[in-house]
């Protein structure tokens, strides 16, 4: 398979998960789109460099996307509210009161995740996306043996923030 076909295949496979990761990290559609595009531009450039083989494409993409999200957050002061784009996950749950409760719960969880340190936020989002501990370690630079403990601490902080 030539490089262009390989890139296209990986783009199709990973664009949506990377975009969703960036959106949840930044809470901004345009920013998520920009960071996702920049991630794949960097991936394409890396593919075309001589002797730069990427061992784990998925982990590499999440690492670059996470770093670009951090850079984006550092450039801007964030005082915007979370967009009201909550999907109703169950068609059966059409009771307006239940929908409102579900929306509030989702908002509280997103806000609690947003209050985490950026590396912990990235870990939680990667965990939600189903990355292995090894992939999370490669993407964040945290030792694989520390990923579980760091994740549980982040989950505890989320729980504590929700209970407040």
Q: What are the residue ranges of the model-derived segments?
A:
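Sigma70-family region 2
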Residues: 40-56, 75-76
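Helix-turn-helix DNA-binding module
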Residues: 114, 118-119, 129-147
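Structural recognition of an alpha-helix C-terminal capping motif at a helix-to-coil junction
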Residues: 20, 34-41, 55-67
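DNA-recognition helix of helix-turn-helix
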Residues: 140-164
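Internal acidic/polar
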Residues: 79-102, 132-133
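A short pre-motif secondary-structure segment
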Residues: 123-124
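Arg/Lys-rich amphipathic alpha helix in sigma70-family domain 2
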Residues: 63-83, 102
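A short, charge-rich alpha-helical start-of-domain segment used by transcription regulators
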Residues: 1-20, 33
């Amino acid at each position: 398979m030539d490089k262009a076909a390989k890139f296209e295949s990986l783009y199709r496979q990973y664009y949506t998960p990377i975009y969703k990761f960036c959106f949840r990290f930044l809470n901004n559609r345009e920013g998520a789109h920009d960071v996702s595009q920049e991630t794949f531009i960097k991936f394409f450039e890396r593919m075309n460099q001589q002797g730069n083989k990427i061992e784990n494409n998925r982990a590499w993409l999440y690492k670059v996307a996470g770093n670009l999200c951090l850079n984006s957050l550092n450039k801007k002061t964030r005082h915007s509210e979370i967009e009201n784009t909550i999907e109703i996950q169950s068609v059966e749950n059409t009771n307006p009161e239940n929908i409102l409760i579900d929306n509030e719960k989702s908002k509280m969880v997103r806000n609690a995740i947003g209050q985490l340190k950026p590396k912990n936020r990235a870990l939680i989002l990667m965990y939600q996306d189903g990355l292995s501990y090894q992939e999370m370690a490669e993407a964040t630079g945290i030792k694989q043996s520390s990923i579980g403990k760091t994740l549980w601490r982040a989950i505890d902080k989320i729980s504590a923030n929700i209970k407040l």
